[in-house]
């Protein structure tokens, strides 16, 4: 196909990033380790990699937003959260209904309620995977509330809150995610 969807956290994995750049027929970027020793430091690493992919691939590239995604307006048109279906499908698609069905019938969130779910140590972004649920499902909490379905709204809120609380991200960052949930009225 002519579209590529990139899970942002995977860009920290050198083998993935190299394979992606090869697939897109663009040059690879420096590694995060190289950035750590550079004057600019690692803070701009992810943003630089994303910009490199967007500008050099010369094709539609979409990013799966997750907890590590930079809050940069220039990337908004490159975000993917089932939005491509709206753009390219010839048939009507109700992504809220699909997300609700997945929450109610397919996703198994119980592990998020464990006091301390431990992700794989060898992958830097692995703990942040839990935060992907927040990006994808916070709007569904709002939809449940609008529909008067407090049972599912409260249950999903508990799961998503646990996903945030049980990470080791800084407290200030946790508060941003919790605020996202609390504003889903």
Where do the PLM segments sit?
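ER/secretory pathway lumenal C-terminal domains and tails of membrane proteins involved
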Residues: 2-185
């Amino acid at each position: 196909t002519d579209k590529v969807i990139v899970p942002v956290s995977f860009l920290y994995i050198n083998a993935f990033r190299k394979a992606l750049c090869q697939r897109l027929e663009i040059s690879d970027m420096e590694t995060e380790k190289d950035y750590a020793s550079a004057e600019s430091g690692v803070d701009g690493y992810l943003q630089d990699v994303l910009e490199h992919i967007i500008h050099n691939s010369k094709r539609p590239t979409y990013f799966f937003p997750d907890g590590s995604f930079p809050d940069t307006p220039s990337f908004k048109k490159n975000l993917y959260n089932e939005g491509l279906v709206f753009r390219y499908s010839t048939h009507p698609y109700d992504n809220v209904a699909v997300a609700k069905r997945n929450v109610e019938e397919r996703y198994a969130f119980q592990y998020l309620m464990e006091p301390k779910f431990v992700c794989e140590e060898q992958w830097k972004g692995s703990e942040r995977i839990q935060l992907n649920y927040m990006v994808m499902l916070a709007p569904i909490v709002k939809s449940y509330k609008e529909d008067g379905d407090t049972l599912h709204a409260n249950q999903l809120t508990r799961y998503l809150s646990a996903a945030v609380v049980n990470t080791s991200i800084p407290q200030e960052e946790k508060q941003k995610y919790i605020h996202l949930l609390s504003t889903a009225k």
